């Protein structure tokens, strides 16, 4: 805070104020927030969406019908592209015109903790699917037959099981039985369905040896079950566990993928669709390195407070941003660069009062939106003269 020049005597006090008001994003480790383009919320089971947003198609036509089945890793949250978007765009570029089907088609609002958010980073894709935060294999096995009968997918792309292991602690015999039941139910509704199972990708919880062993065991179960139950009429393939996901770089909260993690999950499924089913080509490598963090720039306004030496900041929230860093410089004192306050503010702290300013000095502020540990778009700078 030394170069913010809010009065050298008050620098420590300003830092103390920032510490007092800054709290971690719900479930996220914001203390390790990353700057834009660099690289933890727990995987909570939440209520699944219930409203059907896509009516069953009357005719399949020549386009392959794909239904993606998954949990929060697949559904995504506010401001995301999602890995479904990455796969869909890849297939389109390959000349494949997939028809994405399923009962859902929206994001989870990770800030307000509600469903039916439509703030996709790019909404111009087919986002129908069967993916929801909290979805678990042991529940989905009982309803997948009805969904397959309704939406008639040619391909099921499935990434499930993490919630079963992490939240419910099922052992491998139960997981294997549930997996077999899922396959049987899907085939009963559509005997020639093609299924691709994704392996559980790496996440921060797998740093614990016991949970890592549980995930590794289930991934082996997926592979062995696919081999055992695959048939010529209804083949089953297995996609890799995220094509080399780096937990520190590719997940915004240690579990859910950012833009770079999305690409790696999509690539795993794309490669299997190409090699096993001749649907498109393998995902091109090397994978691009994409910017991470919120993409929408917050709109900042600032005004003098009615209290001396204070200013009130408010900003329009960016989709998915659960926290914001405040940057400040004292223009009157001659500061040429912004100094970031040491701790992020949660979204609920908008508006926020900056205190311990020097009366009569003009200050410039800006805020940076962060989603978990990924910090992205900056606001416009806004200036005020301290009362």
Which sequence ranges carry the predicted segments?
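Beta-strand-rich modules
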Residues: 354-373
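Recognizes extended acidic, P/S/T-rich segments that occur
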Residues: 325-358
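Pro/Thr/Ser/Gly-rich low-complexity, intrinsically disordered linker/stalk tracts
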Residues: 278-320, 359, 374-387
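Histidine-centered active-site loop/cap adjacent to the catalytic His
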Residues: 69, 250-297
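Conserved SGNH/GDSL esterase-like catalytic core that processes O-acyl groups on lipids
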Residues: 74-177
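Active-site segments of SGNH/GDSL-like serine hydrolases
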Residues: 159-163, 184-217, 240-242
């Amino acid at each position: 805070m030394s170069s913010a020049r809010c009065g050298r005597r008050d620098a420590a006090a300003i830092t103390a104020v920032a510490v007092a008001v800054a709290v971690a994003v719900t479930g996220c480790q914001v203390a390790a927030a990353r700057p834009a383009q660099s690289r933890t919320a727990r995987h909570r089971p939440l209520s699944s969406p219930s409203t059907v947003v896509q009516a069953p198609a009357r005719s399949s036509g020549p386009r392959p019908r794909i239904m993606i089945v998954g949990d929060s890793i697949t559904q995504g949250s506010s401001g995301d592209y999602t890995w479904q978007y990455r796969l869909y765009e890849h297939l389109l570029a390959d000349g494949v015109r997939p028809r994405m089907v399923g009962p859902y088609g929206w994001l989870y609002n990770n800030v307000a903790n509600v469903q039916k958010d439509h703030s996709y980073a790019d909404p111009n894709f087919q986002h129908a699917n069967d993916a929801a935060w909290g979805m678990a294999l042991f529940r989905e096995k009982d309803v997948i037959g009805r969904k397959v009968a309704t939406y008639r997918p040619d391909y099921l792309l499935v990434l499930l099981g993490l919630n079963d292991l992490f939240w419910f602690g099922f052992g491998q015999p139960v997981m294997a039985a549930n997996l077999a039941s899922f396959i049987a139910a899907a085939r009963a509704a559509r005997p020639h369905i093609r299924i691709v199972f994704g392996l559980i990708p790496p996440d921060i919880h797998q740093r614990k040896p016991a949970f890592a062993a549980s995930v590794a065991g289930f991934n082996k179960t997926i592979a062995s079950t696919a081999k055992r139950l695959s048939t010529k009429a209804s083949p089953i393939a297995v996609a890799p566990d995220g094509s080399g996901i780096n937990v520190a770089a590719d997940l915004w909260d240690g579990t859910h993928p950012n833009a770079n993690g999305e690409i790696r999950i999509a690539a795993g499924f794309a490669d299997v669709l190409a090699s096993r089913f001749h649907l498109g080509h393998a995902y091109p490598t090397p994978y691009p390195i994409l910017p991470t963090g919120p993409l929408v720039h917050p709109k900042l306004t600032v005004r003098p407070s009615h209290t001396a030496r204070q200013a009130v900041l408010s900003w329009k929230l960016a989709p998915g941003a659960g926290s914001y860093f405040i940057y400040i410089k004292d223009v009157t004192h001659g500061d040429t660069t912004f100094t970031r306050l040491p701790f992020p503010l949660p979204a609920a702290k908008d508006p926020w009062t900056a205190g311990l300013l020097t009366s009569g000095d003009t200050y410039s502020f800006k805020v940076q939106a962060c989603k978990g540990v990924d910090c992205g778009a900056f606001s416009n700078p806004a200036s005020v003269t301290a009362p």
